[in-house]
């Protein structure tokens, strides 16, 4: 069974050097008529959490992920996570998956810019989705686009 610990203090996002991908942006469609963007530097400036977790599939092992929650990022862009009907995450490697409102309501979704107190590796950057206590298939790498369908 996966164990998740969420810390709001001491996550020390400033300790993670994102300089190699700080300016990379994630496109978000569905909040407004126009696509909005959030850079990794913008995300690092938000309230961040640190999660210690392990995927239920044990394919990845234990990680300590740091970044803002999806809810925090959306709030910074003027959207409420409770108004989402469906969300689709897209990776630069063409991997994608969707989550419906019931799953979103029941799980914390972390947009991690650091793993184990280190910047993301090239194959994971600029952002990795981490959903504690979930299968690693939901831990999308190289996030570059989020598509939101509002209620």
Question: Residue ranges of each PLM-predicted region?
Answer:
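N-terminal intrinsically disordered, low-complexity segments enriched in P/E/S/T
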Residues: 11-151
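Sec-dependent N-terminal signal peptides
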Residues: 1-3
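C-terminal motif of bacterial Sec signal peptides marking the signal peptidase cleavage site
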Residues: 6-10
């Amino acid at each position: 069974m996966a164990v998740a610990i969420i810390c709001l203090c001491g996550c020390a996002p400033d300790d993670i050097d994102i300089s190699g991908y700080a300016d990379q942006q994630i496109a978000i469609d569905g909040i407004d008529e126009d696509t909005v963007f959030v850079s990794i530097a913008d995300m690092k400036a938000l309230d961040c959490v640190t999660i210690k977790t392990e995927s239920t599939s044990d394919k990845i092992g234990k990680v300590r992920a740091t970044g803002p929650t999806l809810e925090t990022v959306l709030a910074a862009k003027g959207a409420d996570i409770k108004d989402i009907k469906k969300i689709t995450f897209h990776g630069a490697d063409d991997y994608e998956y969707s989550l419906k409102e019931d799953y979103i309501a029941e799980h914390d979704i972390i947009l991690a810019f650091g793993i184990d107190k280190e910047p993301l590796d090239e194959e994971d950057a600029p952002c990795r989705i981490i959903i504690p206590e979930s299968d690693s298939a939901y831990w999308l790498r190289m996030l570059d686009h989020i598509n939101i369908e509002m209620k």
